[in-house]
């Protein structure tokens, strides 16, 4: 039966880690005071009749702490790329220079910092909800084992305690990521 527990815990851990990775991806799209190429990950460019991620039509680099550069591979894509960056909702003003697009990052206002911190909180809460959903699935699996008399009540409680500890540890990591991201956002 320990093999079943190990399999269950490994599956739950994998799913909880997936929620953490999603949270990290969402956090990388939130603007902080520093330039980060991942900031432009959500940008989609109209290319060849379809919407394509920016990283499939250009290279993003960080030459300075408050500047991104976007090197477009196809000269014909420069205007579409500039428009996509301008319209992505991050308040950026791209400046084309041949095939190179400079994207200066303006200072964040206090109001914008608060909005970003709230968005980070919402993302973290979404991750917590996902982790609790995984926990619920694990608990239901344990109850199913108990009903089928594959494990006893005591063993079921032990398994449930281990699932709860896994959940608590993952939620603690989520909270730590949130504190770190809020610190980055509020840093002037």
Curated annotation (Swiss-Prot):
InterPro entries registered for this protein in UniProt: Ribosome_recyc_fac (IPR002661), Ribosome_recyc_fac_dom (IPR023584), RRF_sf (IPR036191)
SUPFAM superfamilies: Ribosome recycling factor, RRF
Keyword Protein biosynthesis in annotation: yes
Physiological role: Responsible for the release of ribosomes from messenger RNA at the termination of protein biosynthesis. May increase the efficiency of translation by recycling ribosomes from one round of translation to another.
GO biological process, one term: cytoplasmic translational termination
Principal subcellular localization: cytoplasm
Keyword annotations from UniProtKB, A to Z: Cytoplasm, Protein biosynthesis
GO cellular component: cytosol
NCBIfam families assigned: frr
Family: Belongs to the RRF family.
Subcellular location: Cytoplasm
One example GO MF annotation: ribosomal large subunit binding
Official protein name in the record: Ribosome-recycling factor
Any coiled-coil regions, as ranges: none
